[in-house]
Amino acid sequence: MEAKAVTRYVRISPLKVRLVMDVVRGMNVDRALATLRYMPQKAAREVARTIKSAAANAEHNFDMDRESLYIKTIYADQGPVLKRIMPRARGMANRIRKPTTHITVVVADRSEY
């Protein structure tokens, strides 16, 4: 049995989020949350939030045991890019890109495999 959680429109670049995800991929849920707690990246907080949500979905919707949950699949997709204008000298302007990310976490019961 699997449970899934998705956090959409997170204001961080997908590349930065994927660096954090690579650390916790395949870990037990509790160990992954403990690891993310001590990471300084802003993306670690968002990934931890999504993992907690997936674990809560597994417990509430499927009556799965939290101790046996592990991160089966975790990935970050690119969301829409917010485009802003920064005025420059002599009437010119530069475009500022503010990327967003969609974070997806799937947790499964390790005892089933």
Curated annotation (Swiss-Prot):
Protein keywords: Ribonucleoprotein, Ribosomal protein, RNA-binding, rRNA-binding
GO molecular function, one term: structural constituent of ribosome
GO biological process, one term: translation
Cytoplasm found in the keyword field: no
Annotated transmembrane regions: none
Function (record text): This protein binds specifically to 23S rRNA; its binding is stimulated by other ribosomal proteins, e.g. L4, L17, and L20. It is important during the early stages of 50S assembly. It makes multiple contacts with different domains of the 23S rRNA in the assembled 50S subunit and ribosome.
Name of the protein described by the UniProt record: Large ribosomal subunit protein uL22
Organism: Chloroflexus aurantiacus (strain ATCC 29366 / DSM 635 / J-10-fl)
